[in-house]
Amino acid sequence: MNIAIIGAGPGGLITALRLQQQGFAPTIYETVPELKPLGVGVDIKVYGLKEIEEIGLLEEFRMMSVDAVDSVFYNHFGQEIYAEKCGVHMGYEHEQRFVHRGELQMLFYRTVQKRLGKDAIVLGARVGSYEQDNAGVTLHLEHRDGRSESVRHDAVIAADGINSVVRKQMHPELSEPHYSGITMYRGTTLREPYRDGHTILHIGDPRISSMIVYPIADNFEGSGKTLVNWVVEAERDESVEDWNQLGSVDEILPFYESVDIDFLDVQQLIADAREVYLFPLIRHEPLETWVDGRVVLLGDAAHAMYPRGGNGVCQAFLDARVVAEQLAAHSDPHTAFLAYDEARRVPVNRIVMNMRGEGYEVIRRMVAERTEGRPLADRADIEGVLPLAEADELFSNYHRLVGQPLRAGHDTYSSGFRTWEAEAVPGSAISEAAVLAPAPAEAPRGESAL
């Protein structure tokens, strides 16, 4: 089967690698004339690591990424409200890891070239539209040198991102997205490691502004320092839906004047940014089908979601595996695509809607509302505002929703703590032995939404 993939982002590239595992030799068409390691950080969840391992790139990925150990939440004053372990440190099968999106993309790019050949990726070729009949699909290409070309394939997988040309042709009635009123400011800062060098921080009152901070590279470019990724959400006039739109820190610094975290100067972190990118939170309505005959959508083209929680890229990894498996199982691409759609669309749409509602980040809003936006008189007062048991239930529901795979013998999805109550290991959030101890046999195991 002669398969085309539109888009050489992480989703399109890993799809090519999954297809190669099934015996296919796809061709990728990419608009840009040269792939470069652009962008900022991404949070690769446990289930995403599993997919990377299955394509044989886990060790290389580990070398370029940072293991996530702790996830800690703070109110608008820098007071801790909740913490949990991450990945294998919580009892999951794989790590959760932080990485620069561009470096991840380049790892996949090099691997595609190695396994499929350099001719497998056609750069500088924009897909303008498609036509199809009972025998195949015709893609109409516009090359950077001004040439127009039409190419023929048996099947087409569109992984052409949030501004997907294929999605607009397939669903013209849903082509206009809706701006949420919120813009993400995404930056990276080179600095000394904070805390243990393996912690993701969630800071702020979402009614004012939210901030996420995590390391994405140790000893960056031999500097001995850590490259730290940060993301700020704030209200702003609508801007272009483009990952590479540059912004300024001056618009967001005032939001964090009251934040006081003993191991991190948040305002200095923002001010020292190497670059800042703007990205508006755009609402794309969930689709009723990803399939049009021999053409199918994948990744952001199929299920663009608010980029919270690291699920956008990781869900594309799952898409890639399932679509490759179905194409290997069915000689008719339309039948294969329908089976893929049936397996993936409904559960992913649930995640899309959950991310639209803040996901687990809602706990910071809950605390802000319950305290009426005031600081806690004492850090221990947080248990009366947000009991650990209540937060644990919320986080467990989220982990089930996205399908985090538990390690054998572990039957719970979340066990929160407060870092100041740590006893066993100085400088660590909590004893890993306590976190990794198997749960009682009678504890119910949540079923994966996937």
Segments (PLM) and residue ranges:
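Acidic/histidine metal-binding catalytic segments
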Residues: 63-64, 120, 258-275, 333-338, ...
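Conserved Rossmann-like nucleotide-cofactor binding loop
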Residues: 11, 34, 163
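Residues at the starts of beta-strands that form the adenosine-phosphate
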Residues: 2, 25, 227
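Conserved N-terminal glycine-rich FAD pyrophosphate-binding loop of Rossmann-like flavoproteins
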Residues: 34-50
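Conserved mid-domain beta->alpha element of the FAD-binding
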Residues: 6-23, 29, 157-158, 185, ...
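Conserved N-terminal helical subregion
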Residues: 1-3, 20, 47-171, 175-188, ...
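Conserved FAD/dinucleotide-binding core of flavoprotein oxidoreductases
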Residues: 80-105, 109, 143-150, 190-278
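C-terminal helical "tail/cap" subdomain of flavin- and related membrane-associated enzymes
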Residues: 78, 309, 325-450
